[in-house]
């Protein structure tokens, strides 16, 4: 597995993410905050820009963060890119990343509204903009970075197309079917989103990437022209016709 060839899109995504991580570290020592520029800010914050919904997924918050994400991309990206082919894989990856960012923005708006409702007696939805103006500095601190949302979408796709494949997951000493790994991941992210509010992890972004990926796969399956290895006129790809498998 270590010597397998990494397909073009997966390889370029790995390279871009590592380049951006190094650039973030280098420019930080020069007094330039790339995370502040390219990370996804809360949409009511002064530093929010629309392009951040795209750029945030190529930024990471630390060595452990990028290592885990790129390991997931290296593990599952080549399989799905080989099955879908490059154009379709890239489209799916970006949609999951955008969807994750969108869900994170909704989650932050809900969090902001709850905080205001708890601290301001008689707070109503109409008072939101007044509170935004009063808390601009605080809102700028809400910044989301990472490819996790897109990668959770890739993980979901792997589970939907290859549900009975087995993989080792720490701390289990035996391999688990991928469909159970996916179910466990969803349950864990839901629990974490509800039970932990200050752990610094965008759990709802992870779930958002999975949600948008699920919707997209279901759409493709309802439109045979788009399903399987094809993507409209850009179809084609390998297919193991000698092996039958069940999928979700």
Language model feature labels by segment:
Residues 1-248:
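A detector for small-residue-rich transmembrane helices and their helix-helix packing motifs
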């Amino acid at each position: 597995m270590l010597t397998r060839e990494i397909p073009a899109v997966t390889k370029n995504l790995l390279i871009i993410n590592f380049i951006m991580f190094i650039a973030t570290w280098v420019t930080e020592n020069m007094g330039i905050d790339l995370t502040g520029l390219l990370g996804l800010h809360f949409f009511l914050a002064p530093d929010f820009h629309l392009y951040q919904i795209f750029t945030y997924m190529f930024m990471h918050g630390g060595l452990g963060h990028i290592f885990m994400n790129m390991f997931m991309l290296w593990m599952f990206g080549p399989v799905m890119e080989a099955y879908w082919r490059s154009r379709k894989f890239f489209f799916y990856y970006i949609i999951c990343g955008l969807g994750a960012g969108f869900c994170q923005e909704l989650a932050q708006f809900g969090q902001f509204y709850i905080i205001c409702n708890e601290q301001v007696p008689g707070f109503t939805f109409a008072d939101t903009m007044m509170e935004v103006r009063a808390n601009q500095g605080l809102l700028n601190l809400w910044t989301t970075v990472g490819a996790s949302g897109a990668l959770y979408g890739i993980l979901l796709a792997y589970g939907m197309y290859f549900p009975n494949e087995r993989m080792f997951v720490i701390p289990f000493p035996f391999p688990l079917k991928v469909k159970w790994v996916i179910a466990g991941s969803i349950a864990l992210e839901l629990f974490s989103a509800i039970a932990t509010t200050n752990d610094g992890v965008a759990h709802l972004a992870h779930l958002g990437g999975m949600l948008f990926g699920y919707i997209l796969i279901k759409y493709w399956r309802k439109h045979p022209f788009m399903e399987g290895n094809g993507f409209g006129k850009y179809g084609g790809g390998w297919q193991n016709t000698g092996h039958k498998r069940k999928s979700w």
